[in-house]
């Protein structure tokens, strides 16, 4: 529905003015004004600027998390805080809280003020000492998890810089996990980059075809690829049923958080559940998200 102004160009490509264009949803309704529209989504949104029921009307049917677990369609999601294991300063904790509140007020839109806080927080979260602590803790924690149930894990970082540096730190401790070969190695970074990002980040750049290859490896429980580090990639629409652990070191909430944690709730053999490991203090955001998407109140 959103209208936006774009450049109006002539046949030669010269800009001759501005024009307003609308989204596909508005054109559909203009073309079929008497049609009934039904929306299907796993994560409806109810913010002031984006509201699923406001567009499609009241819910016809709700199949929530609690029902899915009861039916055996998904496994339970468990939470573990590892905040005490890593060093996030008082300033960092304050920034997380302020950013959280800012995003609440602005319905998850990023103003300049919110971006400034994000940049400040990224510097604290991505400090050399903290990355070393997280790398060491993830290795120990994941190996312990693997000894109980062999599966896959995903690490969510708040920036590409942190993702790249976390990878380097992990393979410093576990050099045998590294491989330059896309088809080998225990851990990979999944992201895109541009030439301006510098060599440390751009060496992790993947094409669409390469990401498809990595996805197949991650979905194969027999493949040696066990851990991936992402910023935004694979947090929606990616299914690897054997994935049992999600390490979160990025401010997340609402439908974005709900979509992310669903990476570990797939049924696989005798997998007892999916585990969310929190390094940033998102417990209240997780509880709110689970409450919103579950009639059982997030239990």
Residue ranges and their predicted role:
Residues 46-58, 268-272, 291:
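Short regulatory helix/loop adjacent to the ATP-binding pocket of P-loop NTPases
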Residues 226-230, 234-259, 274-278:
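A short beta-strand element within the Helicase C-terminal
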Residues 49-150, 167-171:
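Interdomain helical connector at the RecA1-RecA2 junction of SF1/SF2 helicase-like NTPases
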Residues 1-2, 42-47, 83-87, 160-162, ...:
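Conserved nucleotide-binding/hydrolysis micro-motifs of P-loop NTPases
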Residues 117-230:
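Conserved C-terminal RecA-like helicase domain
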């Amino acid at each position: 529905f959103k209208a936006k102004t774009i450049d109006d160009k002539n046949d030669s490509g010269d800009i001759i003015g501005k024009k307003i264009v609308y989204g596909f949803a508005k054109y559909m309704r203009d073309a079929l004004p008497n049609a009934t529209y039904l929306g299907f989504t796993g994560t409806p949104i109810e913010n002031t600027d984006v509201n699923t029921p406001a567009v499609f009307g009241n819910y016809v049917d709700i199949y929530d998390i609690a029902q899915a677990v009861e039916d055996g369609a998904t496994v339970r999601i468990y939470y573990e805080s590892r905040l005490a294991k890593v060093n996030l300063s008082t300033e960092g904790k304050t920034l997380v809280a302020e950013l959280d509140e800012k995003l609440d007020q602005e319905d998850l839109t990023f103003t300049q003020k919110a971006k400034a806080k994000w940049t400040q927080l990224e510097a604290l979260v991505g400090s050399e000492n903290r990355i070393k602590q997280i790398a060491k803790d993830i290795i120990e924690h994941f190996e312990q998890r693997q000894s109980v149930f062999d599966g896959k894990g995903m690490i969510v970082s708040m920036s590409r810089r942190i993702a790249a540096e976390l990878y380097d730190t992990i393979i410093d401790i576990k050099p045998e996990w590294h491989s330059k070969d896309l088809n080998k190695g225990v851990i990979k970074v999944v992201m895109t980059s541009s030439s301006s990002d510098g060599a440390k980040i751009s060496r992790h750049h993947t094409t669409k075809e390469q990401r498809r290859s990595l996805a197949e490896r991650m979905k194969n429980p027999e493949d040696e690829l066990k851990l991936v580090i992402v910023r935004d990639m694979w947090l929606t629409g990616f299914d690897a049923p054997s994935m049992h652990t999600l390490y979160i070191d990025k401010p997340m909430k609402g439908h974005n958080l709900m979509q992310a944690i669903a990476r570990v709730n797939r049924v696989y053999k005798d997998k007892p559940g999916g585990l969310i490991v929190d390094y940033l203090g998102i417990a209240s955001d997780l509880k709110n998200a689970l409450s919103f998407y579950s009639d059982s109140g997030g239990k």
